[in-house]
Amino acid sequence: MEQKDYTLRNDNGRIIFERYTGTDECFRVPEGVTEIAERAFADNKRLKHIDLGDVISVGAFAFQDCSNLETVLMDKAEVISAGAFEFCSSLHTVSIGAVKTIGDMAFRHCRQLDIAEMPRSLTSIGAGTFSHTAIKTARIDWLEEIPRALFSGDTCLTYADISGARIIGETAFAECRSLSVALFGAAESIGSKAFYKCDSFEPAKLPETLKSIGDEAFEKVREELIVPRSVSCFGKNCFGPSDRRKAVCVYESSLYSFSKYFMEEAPDRFDEDEHFHLWESSIDVTVLDDSDKQTGYLPLFTDLDHQLTEKMIDAFKADNSFDYRFIDAELFPGLRWNRRCMDDIVFKRLKNPYDLEEDARRQYSDYLKSHLMRLAKSAVSNNDID
């Protein structure tokens, strides 16, 4: 009698493929088998081609580290469990036309794998599923959530349509360095480092549905990117590294939330000896009113000790007694004290401050003139001029 090089198990009518011990390069799973057990083919270095026949479910790590496996036919498979084909470094072709669920890291580090089209039957997908693959185009516009690290490290990916997704998980496209187009028009949340080090991707517009942007979500953004009013949560360096200059447009109603992007603690008021510690400027903010009209311009700074508070914004708009401690340091660019004086200011420049009443605008102007004049006289008397 012929000795079989595999083991089957009958579990109440379900035929489960338990373990393969053969050395063939090509193998077809016997008819009637509907499940592949956990690690059934794992670490097989000879297998190159496999036909799963009637299999509906592929167990966890079933083919993990089958480093010479090149093609997999599984037209009836509905469930591919976690790590099923992880580290199959030679795998380039799979047929997944009926799949409904793919588990975490199922195809992670399949560095030659390119799936031309994802089946619309797919309703659930795990974290890191296609991380470090060679997929060039991803169209999964029906999924509402893009899981963590889904395509991270896929340097071949150039186009992604995730236009139905409400949630984009952290590092979902991190280090997809060739990605140039990503459609995410329904997104409400973009996770930390979602597009981190996507050097070719510069979003020109963010969706009106967006509410939060995580830390370091984008590597860079298009000049004058408009930040929607809906966004209330901004992560640290969410528009790119702190050492890279950016320019965005922000609505007045979002300015308080936006300020938290730069600063940690908000003072309730200014004291005479209050100091604000500033470093290199990193972002230019054009302020818009509800009709998209520009009302102000703020070059903001990283590493501020304090942030713009609601009380401060209210004072901008109405309070004539507010002490406008803002200095246009560019008025006297030749004075070396300019750089040192930045410890006393929040913003380098504020043009057309927020619909001030005429008296308040005059007070603001007089304050700037008198304060700068005192500083200039002090600099001259101390011979502190370039």
Predicted segments, located by residue:
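Structural signature of tandem-repeat unit edges
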Residues: 1-14, 21-35, 45-57, 67-79, ...
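Repeat-mediated protein-protein interaction surfaces in helical alpha-solenoids
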Residues: 344-364
